Amino acid sequence: LYSDGRFLSSLHVNNNSINELGTIEMSGNEVFKIAVNRLSDLAEETLKDCNMTSDDITWMVPHQANIRIIKAVAKRINLPMSKVIQTLDTHGNTSAASIPLALDTGVRDGRIKKGDMLLFEGIGGGFSWGSVLTEY
């Protein structure tokens, strides 16, 4: 799990007041680069720490923010998209709920089975990012 406030201006809510609503401000190209670099590096770090490679992953269950980010991370860690649970086309970006929704979808449709090795990855504004590697 990581956090780095240097990226705050790339993706944030523009109002700190609790009395007024703010809006999300995002630098799309910058967010894409940060997300792909951080999530790819973290996937490799997590796998290395567990003495595994991308070949050991049955399914990657990523945060469902952007299909381009998901595809770029999968490509960088040599994981085919056929091993990625992707629900953007059904649910869109549901923020913090996207990983649990993707997991539920994969379980309910029978793709994710007992004993599968799952790599979860998420990233959020400000920025914070993390991963979990677990056997289902």
Enumerate the language-model features and the residues they cover:
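Hydrophobic pocket-lining "lid/loop/helix" segments that shape and contact the acyl-thioester
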Residues: 1-87
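Claisen-condensing/thiolase-fold acyl-transfer catalytic domains that form or cleave C-C bonds
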Residues: 36, 58-136
